Amino acid sequence: MSTALLQTTYFGPIQWYQKLYRYDQTLIEQHDSYQKQTYRNRCVIATANGLQALTVPVEHNVQRSTFSVQCKDLRISDHNQWRRIHWNALQSAYSESPFFDYYADDIRPFFEKRYEFLIDFNEAIRQTVCDLLDIHPNVSYTSDFSLQPSAIDDYREVINAKRPQPDADFQPRRYWQVFEDRHGFQANLSILDLLFNMGNEAVFYL
Protein backbone atom coordinates (compact mmCIF):
# COMPACT_ATOMS: atom_id res chain seq x y z
CA MET A 1 0.00 0.00 0.00
CA SER A 2 1.45 3.37 -1.02
CA THR A 3 1.39 6.19 1.53
CA ALA A 4 2.08 9.91 1.07
CA LEU A 5 2.91 12.35 3.86
CA LEU A 6 1.69 15.91 3.26
CA GLN A 7 1.41 19.23 5.03
CA THR A 8 -2.04 20.65 5.66
CA THR A 9 -3.00 23.21 2.99
CA TYR A 10 -5.40 26.09 2.42
CA PHE A 11 -7.01 25.37 -0.97
CA GLY A 12 -3.76 23.61 -1.78
CA PRO A 13 -2.04 23.39 -5.17
CA ILE A 14 -2.91 20.87 -7.84
CA GLN A 15 0.19 18.83 -6.97
CA TRP A 16 -1.11 18.33 -3.42
CA TYR A 17 -4.46 17.01 -4.62
CA GLN A 18 -2.71 14.76 -7.11
CA LYS A 19 -1.13 12.93 -4.17
CA LEU A 20 -4.51 12.54 -2.47
CA TYR A 21 -5.88 11.06 -5.67
CA ARG A 22 -3.05 8.72 -6.59
CA TYR A 23 -1.93 7.28 -3.26
CA ASP A 24 -3.68 4.47 -1.43
CA GLN A 25 -3.34 6.34 1.85
CA THR A 26 -2.43 9.89 2.83
CA LEU A 27 -1.09 11.14 6.15
CA ILE A 28 -1.42 14.84 6.90
CA GLU A 29 1.19 16.27 9.25
CA GLN A 30 -0.23 18.08 12.27
CA HIS A 31 2.73 18.07 14.67
CA ASP A 32 5.18 20.15 12.63
CA SER A 33 6.03 23.71 13.64
CA TYR A 34 4.43 26.60 11.81
CA GLN A 35 6.45 28.29 9.08
CA LYS A 36 5.63 31.46 7.18
CA GLN A 37 4.90 31.57 3.46
CA THR A 38 3.82 27.96 3.06
CA TYR A 39 0.71 26.34 1.65
CA ARG A 40 -0.46 25.67 5.21
CA ASN A 41 -2.23 29.03 5.20
CA ARG A 42 -1.61 30.33 1.69
CA CYS A 43 -2.94 29.62 -1.79
CA VAL A 44 -1.98 31.12 -5.13
CA ILE A 45 -4.48 32.18 -7.79
CA ALA A 46 -4.22 33.72 -11.27
CA THR A 47 -5.60 37.24 -11.65
CA ALA A 48 -5.72 39.89 -14.37
CA ASN A 49 -2.50 41.34 -12.92
CA GLY A 50 -0.67 38.03 -12.55
CA LEU A 51 -0.29 35.65 -9.64
CA GLN A 52 -1.76 36.59 -6.26
CA ALA A 53 -1.14 34.86 -2.93
CA LEU A 54 -4.04 34.74 -0.48
CA THR A 55 -2.88 34.24 3.10
CA VAL A 56 -4.96 33.28 6.13
CA PRO A 57 -3.61 35.25 9.12
CA VAL A 58 -2.80 33.27 12.25
CA GLU A 59 -2.71 34.46 15.84
CA HIS A 60 0.61 35.42 17.39
CA ASN A 61 1.28 34.49 21.00
CA VAL A 62 3.31 37.19 22.74
CA GLN A 63 4.56 34.68 25.32
CA ARG A 64 6.08 32.28 22.81
CA SER A 65 7.11 32.36 19.19
CA THR A 66 4.49 31.45 16.62
CA PHE A 67 7.15 29.28 15.01
CA SER A 68 7.19 27.00 18.07
CA VAL A 69 3.46 26.31 17.79
CA GLN A 70 2.47 23.01 16.25
CA CYS A 71 0.15 23.27 13.27
CA LYS A 72 -2.65 21.49 15.09
CA ASP A 73 -2.68 24.33 17.64
CA LEU A 74 -2.58 27.27 15.22
CA ARG A 75 -5.52 29.61 15.64
CA ILE A 76 -6.93 31.71 12.82
CA SER A 77 -6.90 35.48 13.30
CA ASP A 78 -9.76 37.75 12.28
CA HIS A 79 -7.26 40.45 11.34
CA ASN A 80 -8.00 42.73 8.37
CA GLN A 81 -11.29 41.13 7.28
CA TRP A 82 -9.33 38.57 5.31
CA ARG A 83 -12.41 36.46 4.54
CA ARG A 84 -14.05 39.30 2.62
CA ILE A 85 -10.75 40.14 0.91
CA HIS A 86 -10.17 36.54 -0.20
CA TRP A 87 -13.71 36.04 -1.50
CA ASN A 88 -13.61 39.34 -3.39
CA ALA A 89 -10.29 38.32 -4.93
CA LEU A 90 -11.74 34.99 -6.07
CA GLN A 91 -14.77 36.71 -7.55
CA SER A 92 -12.58 39.21 -9.39
CA ALA A 93 -10.24 36.53 -10.72
CA TYR A 94 -12.74 33.83 -11.66
CA SER A 95 -16.17 35.39 -12.24
CA GLU A 96 -15.60 34.96 -15.99
CA SER A 97 -14.39 31.37 -15.69
CA PRO A 98 -16.74 28.65 -16.99
CA PHE A 99 -17.50 27.05 -13.63
CA PHE A 100 -17.23 29.79 -10.99
CA ASP A 101 -20.99 30.19 -10.66
CA TYR A 102 -21.42 26.42 -10.55
CA TYR A 103 -19.12 26.03 -7.52
CA ALA A 104 -19.61 29.40 -5.80
CA ASP A 105 -22.25 28.14 -3.37
CA ASP A 106 -19.91 25.34 -2.25
CA ILE A 107 -16.90 27.61 -1.73
CA ARG A 108 -18.46 30.82 -0.36
CA PRO A 109 -19.35 29.35 3.09
CA PHE A 110 -15.63 29.06 3.92
CA PHE A 111 -15.50 32.85 3.85
CA GLU A 112 -18.60 33.27 5.99
CA LYS A 113 -18.16 30.74 8.80
CA ARG A 114 -15.49 31.26 11.45
CA TYR A 115 -13.16 28.41 12.36
CA GLU A 116 -10.96 28.57 15.44
CA PHE A 117 -8.13 26.31 14.29
CA LEU A 118 -6.40 26.42 10.92
CA ILE A 119 -6.14 22.65 10.65
CA ASP A 120 -9.90 22.22 11.13
CA PHE A 121 -10.55 24.90 8.52
CA ASN A 122 -8.21 23.23 6.06
CA GLU A 123 -9.73 19.80 6.68
CA ALA A 124 -13.24 21.11 6.00
CA ILE A 125 -11.94 22.62 2.76
CA ARG A 126 -10.24 19.36 1.80
CA GLN A 127 -13.39 17.35 2.30
CA THR A 128 -15.47 19.73 0.20
CA VAL A 129 -12.90 19.96 -2.59
CA CYS A 130 -12.55 16.17 -2.72
CA ASP A 131 -16.33 15.89 -3.03
CA LEU A 132 -16.32 18.41 -5.88
CA LEU A 133 -13.51 16.50 -7.61
CA ASP A 134 -15.35 13.24 -6.94
CA ILE A 135 -12.29 11.65 -5.35
CA HIS A 136 -12.36 9.64 -2.15
CA PRO A 137 -8.89 9.52 -0.57
CA ASN A 138 -8.05 7.58 2.57
CA VAL A 139 -6.82 10.40 4.83
CA SER A 140 -5.60 10.35 8.42
CA TYR A 141 -3.46 12.62 10.59
CA THR A 142 -0.05 11.99 12.13
CA SER A 143 0.10 10.95 15.79
CA ASP A 144 3.58 12.43 16.31
CA PHE A 145 6.36 14.14 14.37
CA SER A 146 8.98 12.14 12.50
CA LEU A 147 11.77 13.91 10.65
CA GLN A 148 12.56 10.96 8.39
CA PRO A 149 9.62 8.54 8.30
CA SER A 150 10.18 5.10 6.80
CA ALA A 151 8.10 3.35 4.12
CA ILE A 152 6.34 6.63 3.32
CA ASP A 153 6.77 9.10 0.46
CA ASP A 154 7.41 12.38 2.26
CA TYR A 155 6.16 15.45 0.37
CA ARG A 156 6.14 17.87 3.29
CA GLU A 157 9.00 19.91 1.86
CA VAL A 158 8.65 18.83 -1.77
CA ILE A 159 5.34 20.67 -2.20
CA ASN A 160 6.72 23.99 -1.03
CA ALA A 161 5.39 27.43 -1.93
CA LYS A 162 8.79 29.16 -1.82
CA ARG A 163 11.30 26.41 -2.57
CA PRO A 164 9.63 23.47 -4.33
CA GLN A 165 11.75 20.36 -4.71
CA PRO A 166 11.82 17.99 -7.70
CA ASP A 167 8.87 15.64 -8.02
CA ALA A 168 9.23 13.20 -10.90
CA ASP A 169 5.63 12.04 -10.50
CA PHE A 170 4.15 15.50 -11.05
CA GLN A 171 4.17 16.90 -14.56
CA PRO A 172 1.79 19.88 -14.79
CA ARG A 173 -0.68 19.55 -17.64
CA ARG A 174 -1.90 22.63 -19.44
CA TYR A 175 -5.60 23.50 -19.18
CA TRP A 176 -7.57 26.59 -20.16
CA GLN A 177 -7.11 29.61 -17.85
CA VAL A 178 -8.97 32.92 -17.88
CA PHE A 179 -5.88 35.13 -18.22
CA GLU A 180 -3.64 32.80 -20.20
CA ASP A 181 -3.66 35.22 -23.14
CA ARG A 182 -2.02 37.86 -20.88
CA HIS A 183 0.36 35.87 -18.71
CA GLY A 184 0.72 32.47 -20.34
CA PHE A 185 -0.19 29.22 -18.64
CA GLN A 186 0.45 29.28 -14.87
CA ALA A 187 1.19 25.80 -13.50
CA ASN A 188 0.34 24.26 -10.13
CA LEU A 189 -1.95 26.98 -8.81
CA SER A 190 -4.60 26.48 -6.15
CA ILE A 191 -6.99 23.63 -6.86
CA LEU A 192 -9.65 26.35 -7.17
CA ASP A 193 -8.06 27.51 -10.42
CA LEU A 194 -8.47 24.04 -11.89
CA LEU A 195 -12.03 23.62 -10.60
CA PHE A 196 -13.28 27.01 -11.74
CA ASN A 197 -11.77 26.58 -15.20
CA MET A 198 -12.34 22.88 -15.90
CA GLY A 199 -15.32 21.85 -13.77
CA ASN A 200 -15.98 18.12 -13.55
CA GLU A 201 -13.07 17.46 -15.93
CA ALA A 202 -10.64 18.72 -13.27
CA VAL A 203 -10.01 15.21 -11.95
CA PHE A 204 -8.45 14.22 -15.29
CA TYR A 205 -5.62 16.70 -14.62
CA LEU A 206 -4.58 15.10 -11.32
Description of each model-found segment:
Residues 1-206:
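Residues lining hydrophobic/aromatic ligand-binding pockets adjacent to catalytic sites
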